[in-house]
């Protein structure tokens, strides 16, 4: 784990200081899901997942409720998801995932950030062969949880990989977690299987996983991280997936 864990830990520690930017982005996803599939989370799986992920980031209930209500407003923005393929220095490639009500504004902002920081926007779909979309679920590792047994139980629902990890906490006490991966088309089946087993999922996402990760030294990593920070500072950017190992 080593360096990879420390890198993730540093990134998470930094995010704790930027919740004022994170909550509006989470709210946008909740509003979009509610507008698409209805305001009732029990009848709208996408909204249910958006709320789950917002709670995982400690988004207050009042903020979540307000985001849902915005979807019912007559003047509710028509928010759409869009992704951009990006090339950066040192062989780094990125999928930049956005949620926006103004594509012209978003593409202009992303291009400006890339142009100022050595990045380049590629033709849409250029990196399809470099990444694979996966369903990813994260939940707490309990003392009585048998991962081998759980793996066997979930294979029929699309599970491809299961791993144990530790998640940094603000109080410094790292927490044992389990992360599972499956085909993105199995997202619903895996979600239902975990629910049926009484496992409380902390985070459920569709992620772009690099097929051939690249290694960077510390200086290169700092430079790319600075670019990622600038992209994530944009109000429309939801996620930045990279091929960094």
UniProtKB/Swiss-Prot annotation:
Compartments in which it is found: Cytoplasm
GO cellular component, as recorded: cytosol
GO molecular function, one term: DNA binding
One of the Pfam families matching this protein, by short name: Transcrip_reg
Keyword Plastid assigned: no
GO biological-process terms attached to the record: regulation of DNA-templated transcription
Superkingdom of the organism of origin: Bacteria
Tagged with keyword Cytoplasm: yes
InterPro entries found in the cross-reference section: Integrase-like_N, TACO1_YebC-like_2nd/3rd_dom, TACO1_YebC_N, Transcrip_reg_TACO1-like, Transcrip_reg_TACO1-like_dom3, YebC-like
Keywords of this entry: Cytoplasm, DNA-binding, Transcription, Transcription regulation
Family indicated by similarity: Belongs to the TACO1 family.
Protein name, as recorded: Probable transcriptional regulatory protein SUN_1622
Organism this protein belongs to: Sulfurovum sp. (strain NBC37-1)
